[in-house]
């Protein structure tokens, strides 16, 4: 079976996606560690962290909406 025309390996778009997710997740993980150090292992830590995630997602939604970008998962 000829492999001409097939690309092997990982595409540049996939690498870019994983690097972007890493850049987003590392600060969030550090935030959680700092909250856990400051508040201890309590529900306050989880509540503050969850609130930050909701605010970030809402900000992303409003930004994408202002640029005219639609979220595809809302149509399902």
UniProtKB/Swiss-Prot annotation:
Keywords: Membrane, Transmembrane, Transmembrane helix. It comes from the Bacteria. Its main location: membrane. The keyword Transmembrane applies. The keyword Membrane applies. It is found in: Membrane. One of its GO terms (cellular component) is membrane. It is a multi-pass membrane protein. Immunity protein that plays a role in preventing early activation of toxin Tse5. This is Immune protein Tsi5. The lineage of its organism: Bacteria, Pseudomonadati, Pseudomonadota, Gammaproteobacteria, Pseudomonadales. The gene is tsi5.
